[in-house]
A protein has these predicted regions:
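Conserved catalytic alpha/beta core of Sir2/sirtuin-type deacylases, generalized to analogous enzyme cores
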Residues: 3-160
Length: 160
């Protein structure tokens, strides 16, 4: 997270983090511009009325919890395999990938679509794509540069 903090300070409002993680730790660590591509475990969505809201109670007092709006059943506000990415997150991430100059791929297998396609979107929009990973993965062909190793050791090489 130290790299993220330094990069965000250096780049200011030009820094955007797109995460596939659903745990909310990037926001808790201080990232101010985060797209939670696969949603957040700290949000709920009603299966009946679609109401969405933050819910940080842990553990939940009742499973499944009732919807405060209609009494229906709530589910975690995350994307399960086979579900569609929320339109807002997908559009925001694609817009950012098309507009960026530098797109970093960090610690992902690149096997989960459509998130894995964002590197190609960035590259086709003339961004430099750099992959930081332990081994080559599903987006390595899109990367202009592949840096092998643990992200905690290799990412700080970008920020002096």
């Amino acid at each position: 997270m130290l790299f993220r903090s330094e990069a965000e300070q250096l780049l200011g409002d030009r820094f955007l983090l797109i995460t596939q993680n659903v745990d909310g730790l990037h926001a808790r660590a201080g990232s101010s511009t985060v797209i939670e591509y696969h949603g957040s475990i700290w949000r709920t969505r009603c299966l009946d009325c679609g109401d969405e809201r933050e819910d940080r109670r842990a553990p939940l007092p009742q499973l499944p919890p009732p919807c405060p709006a209609c009494g229906g059943r709530l589910r975690p506000g995350v994307v399960w395999f086979g579900e569609t990415i929320p339109a807002g997150a997908a559009a925001d991430a694609e817009t950012a990938a098309r507009a960026c100059d530098l797109f970093l791929v960090v610690g992902t297998s690149g096997a989960v679509w459509p998130a894995a396609g964002l590197a190609r979107v960035a590259r086709e929009s003339d961004a430099q794509v750099i992959e930081f990973n332990l081994e080559r993965g599903g987006v390595s062909d899109e990367a202009h540069l592949f840096i092998a190793g643990d992200a905690a050791a290799t990412l700080p090489m970008l920020v002096p």
